[in-house]
Regions:
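Metal-cofactor-dependent catalytic cores
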Residues: 1-298
Length: 298
């Protein structure tokens, strides 16, 4: 094993699962990942989560975090103001077949999403929809098959608290796109939380640990599982139009034997050192763009 030096070049949160992301300069590192990441989710009448796979227009919904509220904007819609600290009745919802406790955010929020996401790309009706907030008292853990027995908690992510990606991986992918006469894409397609610069493409694939010395304490992230890619990177986040050539180019060189040939891009990661217990008065570690990262590679 050897050590490399990287930098945190971007930090992203996605407050509403499958909606637009927010590029931030700093973020508190909580036991479920970056603060406010995937804290809300859109569900259908059965309580099943809705994503860009069924509703590409979710990519056009832009969240903005304020002191006491989240403000959501979308083309042709009035802004929706969502309280950060209030919710309505408790509900049970489903994420990838897993039942999760949540709170409904009310009729106004539900109608807003129903109106904007009224039908799928194929014309199938989606409504009625609801916006729900993750119940912070509920513990939703990552698969210990991949965490080597470590309990890692999530909110509404697909299964892990963090997604790490190297900036060079995107640059390499864009070189492959342009070589085929296709336009380059931006980082928003791949929805990472932590982007690393100053290292080679896909260094995260071979990293055993990522150590960041924050102002509060040293934290260690462990990449544990390659991130399999579905159709979401095909969705242009600016237009919500589908561009299937993105997946086709990925599949040409990113089939991963660790996941039986699935196409992967980026690594799901957990926090192994530096978290503050939920009942502690200590401040949480704050990740910042520009922080140095010690990358221990196999």
């Amino acid at each position: 094993m050897s050590d490399l030096q990287a930098l945190v070049s971007q930090l992203w949160i996605y407050p509403v699962k499958s909606c637009g992301g927010v590029s931030v300069l700093s973020a508190n590192l909580t036991e479920t990942g970056l603060e406010w990441d995937r804290a809300w989710m859109v569900v259908d009448a059965q309580g099943d989560f809705v994503s860009q796979r069924e509703a590409p227009r979710m990519a056009l919904i832009e969240p903005k975090m304020r002191h006491l509220e989240m403000v959501l904007r979308a083309p042709g819609m009035l802004a929706l103001h969502v309280s950060l600290h209030e919710a309505e009745e408790p509900v049970q919802v489903t994420v990838w077949g897993e039942t999760v406790k949540a709170y409904d955010m009310g009729a106004l929020a539900g109608q807003w999403f129903t109106d904007f996401l009224s039908q799928t790309e194929e014309g199938r009706a989606l409504g009625p929809l609801r916006l729900v907030r993750f119940d912070p008292e509920f513990q939703r853990a990552s698969s210990t098959k991949w965490t080597q027995g470590v309990q890692a908690l999530n909110q509404f992510s697909d299964g892990y608290p963090l997604l790490v990606l190297s900036a060079a991986a995107l640059a390499e992918f864009n070189e492959r796109l342009t070589a085929q006469g296709l336009p380059p894409v931006d980082m928003a397609r791949f929805r990472p939380n932590v982007v690393l610069s100053e290292v080679a493409a896909h260094t995260e694939d071979h990293a055993k640990a990522l150590t960041i010395v924050t102002d509060q304490r040293s934290v260690t992230l462990r990449p544990v599982k390659p991130c399999p890619r579905c159709s979401i990177p095909n969705v242009d986040p600016q237009t919500a139009e589908l561009q299937p050539q993105v997946s086709a180019v990925l599949a040409s060189y990113r089939q991963d034997a660790r996941l039986e040939g699935a196409v992967t891009f980026g690594m799901n990661a957990i926090v192994t050192e530096g978290l503050v217990p939920a009942n502690s008065d200590e401040p949480e570690a704050v990740l910042k763009v520009g922080q140095a990262v010690q990358v221990q590679v196999f």
